[in-house]
């Protein structure tokens, strides 16, 4: 196996693992975009960005294409609901943001920026895991005046 093959395998594997860690957290939380979705997004982004690295194509165009495609995918994950009494609620923003970050991690892995992958993955997991209870605490103890009570509890994880 040549060095090029090994390097490509390592880069794609790093994209899959980093994306999988984030997807696992989303799966645990009962989100629709979970483990496999995040892994596929990360790998797909890594594949698209790695293609121009081997030739003369402009890598920035590949990055722009991934960003556009991920924007459409994330938009499909966001749901705007109209509730009773004229209340409105938006769901899926965190999942959409985690998909967007996953794509970025895949692109970063494709170019071999290992420190960025590690810091980005750890930072994302800290935000998703550590900030979840902080967000719940803030919503319960410092509610915004224009947010209906029913929507304040929407950050609670689904019960099994």
Locate the predicted segments by residue.
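Alpha-helical transmembrane segments and their membrane-interface boundaries
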Residues: 1-63, 110-113, 117-119, 127-140, ...
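Short, amphipathic, aromatic/basic-enriched membrane-interface segments that mark the entry/exit
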Residues: 29-36, 82-94
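Hydrophobic alpha-helical segments embedded in the membrane of multi-pass proteins
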Residues: 39-46, 64-75, 96-100
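Generic transmembrane alpha-helix signature in multi-pass membrane proteins
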Residues: 48-52, 74-84, 101-113
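Alpha-helical transmembrane-segment detector that highlights a single hydrophobic TM helix
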Residues: 57-87
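Alpha-helical transmembrane segments and their membrane-interface exit regions
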Residues: 69-76, 123-133
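Structural signal for the N-terminal portions of transmembrane helices
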Residues: 88-130
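An accessory alpha-helical subdomain
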Residues: 142-144
């Amino acid at each position: 196996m040549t060095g090029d093959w090994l390097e490509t395998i390592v880069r794609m594997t790093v994209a899959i693992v980093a994306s999988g860690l984030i997807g696992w957290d989303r799966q645990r939380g009962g989100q629709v975009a979970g483990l496999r979705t995040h892994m596929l997004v990360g790998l797909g982004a890594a594949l698209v960005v790695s293609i121009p690295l081997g030739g003369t194509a402009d890598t920035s165009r590949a990055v722009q294409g991934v960003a556009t495609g991920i924007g459409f995918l994330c938009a499909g994950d966001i749901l705007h609901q109209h509730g009773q009494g004229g209340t409105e609620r938006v769901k899926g923003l965190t999942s959409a943001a985690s998909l967007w970050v996953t794509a970025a991690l895949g692109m970063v892995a494709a170019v071999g920026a290992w420190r960025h992958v590690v810091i980005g993955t750890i930072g994302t997991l800290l935000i998703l895991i550590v900030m979840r209870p902080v967000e719940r605490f803030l919503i319960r103890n410092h509610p915004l005046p224009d947010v209906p009570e029913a929507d304040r509890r929407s950050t609670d994880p689904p019960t099994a």
